[in-house]
Each structure stands twice: as C-alpha cells, then as structure tokens.
Amino acid sequence: MSRRSLTVWGVRLWFGALLLFGSEILIWTDPFALSIVDWLGRGFVCTLIATLLLDLAARFRIRDIYDSMALLAIGALLIGLLTAPNFAHADFPRTLLTRVLGAYGLTGLEMLGLMLVLCCVVDRRVRRLILPVAAWNGFYFGVWLRWMPVFNPQIAPFVPLEQALLLAGGVFLPCAALWWGLRHPLRQLHPLDLRLPVVPFLLLIAALIALSLPSLITGALTTGPLVASLLLMGVSYAVLYFRRSPRDPMLLDAFLPAAPTNGWWLLGIVGAFLAACLFAYNLPLAGSDQINQLWLMEVGFGAVGALWYPLVAAVLAFRAVDEQMRRNQL
C-alpha cells in the first residue's frame, strides 16, 4: 500500500473516530454499558460511514454548509440504523427527527467542521467560531450529563462527572492522536484522493446493507424506520447529485492539501469544552420539572431535525432561482 493510500485511510479512520465520539459521547446514553467488542464494532461502522461520506463529498464536489447538511443527513440516518436503532427509533417517527436528524445530524456536522478546522484554519470567521462552538458543545454536554439521569434515567443512567469526562477523554484521545500523526501527510493529500474506485464503492454499499441485517432479523430495526431512512437518504443523494458542478470550487479545496492547525488550537478547543461543561453541570435547575435547560436542549434537537431538509430545500431553491434570474432565464 502506498504512502498516499495510507494517508487516505488514516483520514477515513480519523473522521470515523470523530463520528464515534459525536454519536456515543456527545449523545450520551449509557456508553459504560458497551463492551470492548461493542466499541470496536461501532468504531468499524463509523469508519465505513466516514469512508462513504468523504467519498460523496469529493465525488459530488460539495460546496457549502447546505451541501454538507444533505451529506451529513446520510451519515446520521446510517448511524441511526446501524449503531443503536433501539435508541434512535424508540418512538418512530418522533425520534427520527429529534435523535437521528437532530442529534446525530448536528453532531456529525460539527465533527466534519472540527476535522476541516484541524486540517486548515483559512478564514477569520471560522477562527472566531471555533471556541464558541466548542463551548456550546461543552455546555450542552454538561446539561445532558447532569439532568438527563434525573428526568430520563432510562436513556442515560447517572454517572459521576469525573468518570464521564475520563471516558470522553479516552474516546477523544485516538481522534487527537490520528490528527497529530496525519499532520504532515495531509500536506500532500488532495480532495479527489478520497474518492473510491467503482468496485470498492459498491462493496462499501454492500457492507453497509449487510450490517443492517442482524438488527432486522432480531427486530431491533423495523421496516418503518428503515423505509423512511432509505427514502430520506435518497433525497439527500439526489440533492448532492443535482448540485454537483465540475467548474465551481468545492468545500474540500479550502482545506486540502492541508496546512494543519497549530496544536494550541486543539488545546483551546478542549479547554473551552471542559470549562463550559463544568459550568453547565453545576448550574441549578432553571425553571420547572417540565420546562428547563434540558427541555430546551431537547426542543432544539427537535427543531433542528424538523427544519433540516426544509432549510436545505429552501436555500437551494432560492439559489437556483437567483442563478436563473442572473442569466435572464426567468
């Protein structure tokens, strides 16, 4: 295997590790109940999903955050189907919006953003957003850890903060180690290197399909969530397919070949996350048992999930009309 191929697979593994961190740690349910085999299995699934997402990002030349939202919806739907269908689709169709598109979709988008930022911080606006986004994630994580065991212990049993942070650090450590090891090889990597040849791409799709069979056989995954997820993935794929443009620069062009971010940025991101987490964890309950900071988080996930596709559709439709008007075709 060539050095470039090793780098490409390193990037896929790195993004897979970030997706695992987002889906199992930031969306904290009961990760201490997972065995080593469970963690390895979910890490393998997340790496396959990361491989698919990076291929589609390069194949269809995604250009902006709205293309990224269509892309990460596919990732969120696959995570919901393959890693924890009992949690993701516990109350279908409500949890399809709140937990899959809302929670998994948003954290997946953030993990993609973190990966790109660590590859190269090229924009001052991006620099200004890094630490606030990290702090927001820490605040949300602290609220979830503190109050979810109180109001929904069946979702997230109580775990001492110190143990939760140790596990979070243990899962994030491979992400940081992979980034550190890839810092120099990333300087020679180009976006189109992330595309798979046709046969490996088809094998990847076949592997993802095969991984859904055990859940279908055991009944953990029912036909309703499966059909709905496949339809939504088809919508996302169509958006990416019809949005592709061989002429316009793609999002990955701004980050690859990489000029890796200084290590102090990663320390700052971790520091902002931890500080906000500790602050939120020690806040008293604001409001009542029905309306409080945890309730606001859950409503926020629901709103994100409900608006995910309509927002993408509205923005892309507006841009298409605007482009046609500029060409005097309307």
Locate predicted features.
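Membrane-interface helix-loop-helix junctions at boundaries between adjacent transmembrane segments
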Residues: 61-70, 82-161
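Generic multipass alpha-helical transmembrane bundles of integral membrane proteins
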Residues: 114, 128-238
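Membrane-embedded alpha-helical segments in integral membrane proteins
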Residues: 17-31, 81-87, 142-151, 205-216, ...
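Membrane helical hairpin/interfacial module
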Residues: 35-88, 95-97
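Alpha-helical transmembrane segments
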Residues: 8-23, 74-75, 133-139, 200-208, ...
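Extended, charged low-complexity segments
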Residues: 208-330
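N-terminal signal-anchor module of multipass membrane proteins
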Residues: 1-60
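Hydrophobic cores of alpha-helical transmembrane segments in multi-pass inner/ER membrane proteins
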Residues: 43-54, 102-117, 166-183, 229-243, ...
